[in-house]
């Protein structure tokens, strides 16, 4: 069981690292504090891109894109897995993503991913996933 704290981690780098970990092993991966993961880039451009992604298509026919930060993070990881095949579905079943810290993981030892740390950014342009989620209308 691996518990990863997403606070201050870059979304894409976190997602690719977790996807590799899920495909290579049999252990469960829990991600806590999903709303505190960051997306690098201009705040206005990032919010616009996520809004356009959410508004694409029709409400009856899809594509359906999540609003909540835990679901956005899980969808990002899903995009890096072969989720239509058995090994991808199996990998997704071992992943749990939470907003905040759930009761059962309060005392658990957390790890972080050094390659995904926000201190690696060359600029200070970023936005938290929770803020993106709130701008899309989420009430997490």
Curated annotation (Swiss-Prot):
Domain of life, source organism: Archaea
Any single GO BP term: negative regulation of translation
Alphabetized UniProt keyword annotations: Ribonucleoprotein, Ribosomal protein
Entry-linked CDD domains: Ribosomal_L13 (cd00392)
GO cellular component: cytosolic large ribosomal subunit
This protein's record includes keyword 4Fe-4S: no
GO molecular function: mRNA binding; structural constituent of ribosome
Pfam families in alphabetical order: Ribosomal_L13 (PF00572)
Quaternary structure (record): Part of the 50S ribosomal subunit.
Role played: This protein is one of the early assembly proteins of the 50S ribosomal subunit, although it is not seen to bind rRNA by itself. It is important during the early stages of 50S assembly.
Family: Belongs to the universal ribosomal protein uL13 family.
Annotated PANTHER family: LARGE RIBOSOMAL SUBUNIT PROTEIN UL13, RIBOSOMAL PROTEIN L13
NCBIfam families referenced in this protein's UniProt entry, alphabetically: L13_A_E, PRK06394.1
Protein name: Large ribosomal subunit protein uL13
Gene, per the UniProt record: rpl13
């Amino acid at each position: 069981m691996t518990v990863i704290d997403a606070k201050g981690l870059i979304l894409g780098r976190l997602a690719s690292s977790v996807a590799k970990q899920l495909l290579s092993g049999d252990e469960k991966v829990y991600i806590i504090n999903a709303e505190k993961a960051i997306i690098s880039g201009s705040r206005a451009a990032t919010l616009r891109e996520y809004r356009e992604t959410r508004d694409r298509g029709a409400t009856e026919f899809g594509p359906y894109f999540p609003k909540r930060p835990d679901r956005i993070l899980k969808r990002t990881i899903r995009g890096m897995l072969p989720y239509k095949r058995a090994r991808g579905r199996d990998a997704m079943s071992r992943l749990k993503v939470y907003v905040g810290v759930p009761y059962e993981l309060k005392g658990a030892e957390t790890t972080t991913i050094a390659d995904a740390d926000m201190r690696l950014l060359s600029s200070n342009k970023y936005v938290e996933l929770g803020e993106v989620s709130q701008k899309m209308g989420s009430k997490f």
